Amino acid sequence: MPRYELALILKAMQRPETAAALKRTLEALMDRGAVVRSLENLGERTLPYKMSAHSQRHTRGGYFLVDFYAPTTTVASIMEHLSRDIDVIRPNVVKHPLTQEVKECEGIVPVPLEEKLYSTKKRK
């Protein structure tokens, strides 16, 4: 299963309502076969511009980041479910960048200058 990140903006609510909305969201992910790795609260802040969702205009929102594994076939279903949730302003699922170690390219090892000179002298 590939790894995904769900960037989620919830409408500004009190702590119990926010917890209930997050619980609903995570249960929806797990019901569709996802394995949740982590949930990160990025805080509540003013939105960069007024956003409309479910016939309401929002100026503040809570930002959350969910890291999860899921089958590729369920991502569309997850997005459809989240777009219908009245507490969600913006859901956005992106494939997690690969976290492999970056190896330094060995490339072509430069030949020492002396060997290069000797090899050219022998040819003549």
Curated annotation (Swiss-Prot):
Q: Where in the cell is it found?
A: Mitochondrion
The record's listing under Gene3D superfamilies reads: 3.30.70.60
The record's Pfam families line, in alphabetical order, gives:
Ribosomal_S6 (PF01250)
GO BP annotations listed: mitochondrial translation
Write one Gene Ontology MF term: small ribosomal subunit rRNA binding
User: What SUPFAM superfamilies does the database record attribute to this sequence?
Assistant: Ribosomal protein S6
One cellular component (GO) term of this entry: mitochondrial small ribosomal subunit
Q: What is its main location?
A: mitochondrion
InterPro entries hit by this protein: Ribosomal_bS6, Ribosomal_bS6_sf, Transl_elong_EF1B/ribsomal_bS6
Q: What UniProt keywords are attached to this protein's entry?
A: Mitochondrion, Ribonucleoprotein, Ribosomal protein
Q: Report the superkingdom from the record.
A: Eukaryota
Cite the PANTHER family for this sequence: MITOCHONDRIAL 28S RIBOSOMAL PROTEIN S6, SMALL RIBOSOMAL SUBUNIT PROTEIN BS6M
Subunit annotation: Component of the mitochondrial ribosome small subunit (28S) which comprises a 12S rRNA and about 30 distinct proteins.
Please give the family membership noted in the entry. Answer: Belongs to the bacterial ribosomal protein bS6 family.
What protein am I looking at?
Answer: Small ribosomal subunit protein bS6m
